[in-house]
């Protein structure tokens, strides 16, 4: 079957080019803020302001977790946030203001300095960062991340999983990856499968990456 041929070809290419060694970086997970302006139909990460799972990590909490990460020999601090929550939630804006910042990206830049000073390398995954935000984070982060998920605009149509997720516009995500390449920032990315995509769309997304 054509699908099996594709899988076998991809596997062979990986083995030839990359080998079979799997490396990893021991990390601590920093759920900085899980409010998010997007609503993806499959998401279990996002919280609403009244949810019990809401996470708002202040500077001291970030510092304390970084110290614990160092104690347990973690190399990396994985910063994860929702997509620009301050654009949708007054609660996010008020919280950021209380911490002394006007945007999530600005706060992440500061938190990156905190964990680096504790001896842990920050890696930030915060959605569609601007080029200038990426340049600032580049000063402290060993790498950045943004999931392409899929480069098909069809998944943004009515009734599809990214209908209410403006940041998942493929052009915007690809632009982040392009900026990372131009700025020489190591980047993690990938596809999300099982959200209504076709095999052809998966293949095209890999080629786009």
Regions found by a protein language model. Name each.
Residues 2, 28, 32, 107:
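Conserved acidic
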Residues 49-209:
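Conserved Radical SAM active-site core
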């Amino acid at each position: 079957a054509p699908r099996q041929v594709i899988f076998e070809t991809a596997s062979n290419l990986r083995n030839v080019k990359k080998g079979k060694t799997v490396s990893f970086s021991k990390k601590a997970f920093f759920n900085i803020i899980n409010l998010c302006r997007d609503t993806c139909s499959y998401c279990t990460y996002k919280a609403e302001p009244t949810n019990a799972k809401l996470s708002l990590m202040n500077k001291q909490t970030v510092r304390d977790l970084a110290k614990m990460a160092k104690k347990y020999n973690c190399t990396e601090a994985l910063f994860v946030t929702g997509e620009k929550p301050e654009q949708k939630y007054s609660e996010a804006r008020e919280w950021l203001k209380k911490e002394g910042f006007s945007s999530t990206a600005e706060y992440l830049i500061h938190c990156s300095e905190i964990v680096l000073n504790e001896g842990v390398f920050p890696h930030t995954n915060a959605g569609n960062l601007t080029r200038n935000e990426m340049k600032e984070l580049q000063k402290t982060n060993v790498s950045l991340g943004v999931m392409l998920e899929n480069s098909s605009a069809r998944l943004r149509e009515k009734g599809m999983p990214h209908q209410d997720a403006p940041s998942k516009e493929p052009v915007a995500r690809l632009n982040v990856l392009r900026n990372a390449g131009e700025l020489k920032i190591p980047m993690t990315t990938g596809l999300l499968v099982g959200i209504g995509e076709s095999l052809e769309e998966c293949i095209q997304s890999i080629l786009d990456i």
